[in-house]
A protein has these predicted regions:
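Generic surface-pattern signal
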Residues: 12-19, 123-131
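Metal-dependent nuclease catalytic cores that hydrolyze phosphodiester bonds in DNA/RNA
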Residues: 1-36
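Mg2+/Mn2+-dependent nuclease catalytic core
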Residues: 26-130
């Protein structure tokens, strides 16, 4: 129900931003980081670049500083897409819809999340969870 509402509210912005769908809800993994997941959308955006797009719900509007964990998540997905599909993500976008129906769009580049940051996050996770 929430996903349907989020999609309907963000549809006008999505239509303007997405030019071609490459893949949706596709499972990917990284042997290097020993993680797996399923991304929301891989597309060609209005700039003609391969873009990883993620949908998020939020109770209220957020600032870019409040969504750094989502930026990091996109970094891991970008790595998994490269390893699994052999595709190089050029842009990363988050569409966030608030309870009131406000749609926020956050833009990142893969280089915004350096590899060293991903390695540190994964190492920290391993230490906490003993994996």
């Amino acid at each position: 129900k929430a996903a349907t509402r989020m999609f309907k509210v963000s549809l006008p912005k999505l239509r303007a931003y997405v030019k071609e769908v490459v893949a949706m809800e596709t499972p990917v993994w990284s042997d290097q980081f020993r993680i797996a997941g399923r991304f929301d959308l891989l597309c060609i955006n209005k700039h003609g670049r391969l873009c990883l797009l993620d949908f998020k719900n939020s109770r209220r509007a957020k600032t870019v500083d409040q969504i750094q964990n989502y930026r990091q998540q996109l970094g891991f997905y970008t790595q998994m897409i490269k390893e699994t599909l052999g595709k190089t993500v050029e842009d990363q976008t988050i569409f966030m819809v608030t309870r009131e129906g406000f749609v926020q769009q956050f833009q990142f580049k893969p280089e915004d999340t350096p590899r060293s940051e991903l390695v540190a996050i994964r190492k920290h996770f391993w230490e906490i969870h003993h994996v």
